[in-house]
Amino acid sequence: MTQNWIDAACLDDIPEGDVVGVKVNGKEIALYEVEGEIYATDNLCTHGAARMSDGFLEGREIECPLHQGRFDVCTGKALCTPLTKDIKTYPVKIENMRVMLKME
């Protein structure tokens, strides 16, 4: 599959220590700012249809607003029940203050 870097957001639109939801090529993505780095995952929880961008970000962990399961936003790893499936992550790079995602 061909992967392309896609412009997802302005870096300034992602508050420090917070999460925002964006739509990239029709797909919902959550963007996180953690200790000066930007991370990206699917925006929908793997357990339910909750948006991760509505969740609570604490350090590297995002808590799903529906059932309080937690994911590591850097790796996508599901950290506790009721989650059993990891969340998809996307490579990120910053170019000219734009957040670029590598998507399939």
Swiss-Prot record:
Domain Rieske per the UniProt entry, residue ranges: 6-101
Top-level taxon in the UniProt lineage: Bacteria
CDD domains per the record? Rieske_RO_ferredoxin
Q: Which UniProt keywords apply?
A: 2Fe-2S, Aromatic hydrocarbons catabolism, Electron transport, Iron, Iron-sulfur, Metal-binding, Plasmid, Transport
GO CC terms of this entry? catalytic complex
Describe what happens without this gene. Cells lacking this gene are not able to convert salicylate to gentisate.
Give the required cofactors. [2Fe-2S] cluster
Q: How is the cofactor bound?
A: Binds 1 [2Fe-2S] cluster per subunit.
Picking any one GO biological process from the record gives: salicylic acid catabolic process
> Pfam families this protein is in?
Rieske
Record keyword Methyltransferase present:
no
Q: Which InterPro entries match?
A: Rieske_2Fe-2S, Rieske_2Fe-2S_sf
Which amino acids does the record list as binding [2Fe-2S] cluster?
C45, H47, C64, H67
The Swiss-Prot or TrEMBL record annotates one GO molecular function as:
2 iron, 2 sulfur cluster binding
Named in its record, the pathway it takes part in is: Aromatic compound metabolism; naphthalene degradation
What family does the database annotate? Belongs to the bacterial ring-hydroxylating dioxygenase ferredoxin component family.
User: What does the function comment of this entry state?
Assistant: Component of two multicomponent enzyme systems which are involved in the catabolism of naphthalene. Plays a role as an electron transfer component for both salicylate 5-hydroxylase (S5H) and naphthalene 1,2-dioxygenase (NDO) systems, by transferring electrons to the oxygenase components.
Q: How does it assemble?
A: Ferredoxin NagAb belongs to both the salicylate 5-hydroxylase (S5H) and the naphthalene 1,2-dioxygenase (NDO) multicomponent enzyme systems. The NDO multicomponent enzyme system is composed of an electron transfer component and a dioxygenase component (iron sulfur protein (ISP)). The electron transfer component is composed of a ferredoxin reductase (NagAa) and a ferredoxin (NagAb), and the dioxygenase component is formed by a large alpha subunit (NagAc) and a small beta subunit (NagAd).
- Its recorded name reads Naphthalene 1,2-dioxygenase/salicylate 5-hydroxylase systems, ferredoxin component
Q: Which organism is it from?
A: Ralstonia sp
Q: What gene name does this entry carry?
A: nagAb
